[in-house]
Amino acid sequence: MHKCLLLLLITLGSYALHSQEPTIQRDSSAIENDTISKIDYLKYLGNGYFPTKFLNVDLRYLVKFNQYEGFRTGLGGITNDEFSEKYRINSYVVYGFKDHRFKYRIGGGFRINEATDTWINLSYTDDLQETGSSSFLTDKRFFQFFEPRLLNIDLFHKHITKAINIEHKLTNHLVTETEFAISKIEPTYSYNFVIGNESFRSFDISTAKISAQWSPFSHFETIKDKVTQTKEGFPKFTLQLTQSFKNVLKGDFNYFKVDFRTRYKITHNDKVFSEIVLSSGLATGNTPLTHLYHAYPNNITKETVLQRFSVAGINSFETMYFNEFFSDRFATLQIKHFVKPFRITERYRPQLVLISRFALGNMQDIERHQNITFGTLNKGYSEAGFEINKLLFGFGLSFAYRYGGYHLPEFADNLAAKFTFNVSL
C-alpha cells in the first residue's frame, strides 16, 4: 500500500511539473491568449491552488501540523477544464511524521448536465477527522495559508469512507448536494460508546446527507457562457440533514442530525462593516461522540497566558479550551464589527475588529460516552474581545475574555492573547 501511495505522490508531482507549458518566444497577443492573467492567477492562489495546464495543485496538502500527526506533508490536486470539462480527478496523498501513516483520497467525477451543473462524484478516503467537527456539503472551498486551530488539535478519529456524491443547482440562488457514504470509524483516543449492554470501541456508519444553500440576494450574470456571481448578497442560509442507518451496509447506529447556519453582512460605509454568523445543530438517536458537536474551541490547556499564546482562528472561541465541551444540541452566535482602517501611511493601515461570541448547548445520555471527560454548554458560554490586524507583514494581535456562566476563578485563565495573520492577494 505504501508503495502505491508513493507512486501516486510521484505521479501527481510529475504531472504538475510536466503540465506547465515550456517558456518560448511568442508575440504579445499569443502570450495574452495562452497564459493565465495575473488576476486569475491570484484568484487561484487565494483559493489554495497552484494552476498548471491540466492540473491545479492543491496547496492545502503541502505542509500542515497538528498534535497527533506532527508534521503532515504531501501533494494533491484536481484536474481543470483544460483536461476535461466533463470529467475530473480529485486526489491527494499525505504522510504524518509523528504517527508514521499515509493518508489519501482517490476521487473523481463526471458531469451529467451542464445547465444545472450536475455532477456525480465518487471517492475513497483513508484519513483523520477532528472529533466534534462538522461541515456542510455545499460549503465553498475555504483556504488559509495555515490553519490556526489545527496546530493544537489532538482529538482525531480515523475513518475509511466510501462515498457517492451528487451536486445539483436548482437555481443560481439555490444549490444542493446529496451524499451516500459508508465509514469505518476508529477513535485515536481512549473512548467507548455504550448502548445498553453493548460497548463500541470502533464502529461502522452508513449515512445519507442532503445539503442546500440558499443565497436569495446574490446577483449572477452569464460571462463567457458561464454563470458567475457578480455580487455576494446577504443573508445566506444553509441547511443540512443527515440520517444514519443501522443494519444497512453494516451500519451500527440509527441517528438523525439537522444543521443550520445563516450568515449576514451589514455594510455601513467604505471598509466599515459587521458580520453575523448564527450556527446550530441537533443530533438525536444513538450518535457517537465523533459525530457530535464542539463549538470550535481554540485555547490550549497551559498555565499562563504567554504559554497559551498562539494563532487566533477565524470563527473559533479563543478562550474555550480544547475538548472542554461537547453537545448533541447547540447554537452559536458570533458578531464581528470591522472599524475603518487607521490610515497611518498610504500603505500602513491597521484595522480594529470588535468581537462578541456566545454558545449554548446540552447533551442527553452523557453517560454513554466512556473514558473521556467533558462538560456541556447549558449555562451559556460568552466571550468578547478585539483584534488589531495587519500591524506588520499581515500579522496582528488578538485579545479575548471569557465571562458569564463559565467564567473561571482565576483572572488569567479567562484571558486569551494571540496573534492574527491576514493577507490579501
Placement of each model-derived feature along the sequence:
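Single-residue recognition of alpha-helix boundary sites
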Residues: 13-14, 183
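Boundary at the C-terminal end of the N-terminal hydrophobic targeting segment
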Residues: 16-19
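Sec-dependent N-terminal signal peptides
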Residues: 4-13
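Exposed, low-structure sequence patches enriched in small/polar residues
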Residues: 21-95, 99-425
